Amino acid sequence: MNESGERPVIEYSALAQALRKFAAERDWEQFHSPKNLVMALTGEAGELAEVFQWMTEEDSKAAARNPSTAQAVRDELADVLLYVVRAADVLGVDLNAAVTEKLRVNAEKYPVDASRGNSRKYTDL
C-alpha cells in the first residue's frame, strides 16, 4: 500500500534492490550512468525486436510459446525490464508514481467512447 492506502500499480522495489546489489558486487555502478543504461536498454529492445523481425502476425502471437523463440522472447523481455528498473533507480524515478500518472494521462488522451476499437493517435480522435 502507498501513502494514500492504494495498492501500487507495479511493485518493483525488490527488483531494484537486487539490481543495485548485483551492480555493487561487480563495481559496475561507475558504468551505470543514465546515458549508458538507456543505450543498453535501447540495444536490448532492439534484440527483442530482432526476435520478431519478419514473423507473420500469427507467428508473433505465438512467439512466447514456440520452442524456437520462447527462450529468446523471455530473455529479451527480462533484459528490457532490468534496464528500465535500473535506469529508474539510478535516476531516482518512482516507477509506480510514473506509471500511475501515465495511465491517468493516457486515459484522458484516449477516452473509451472515442478510442474503442480503433488505432488512431489521440490527436486524430
Predicted feature residues:
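Flexible "arm" and connector segments at domain edges
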Residues: 1-125
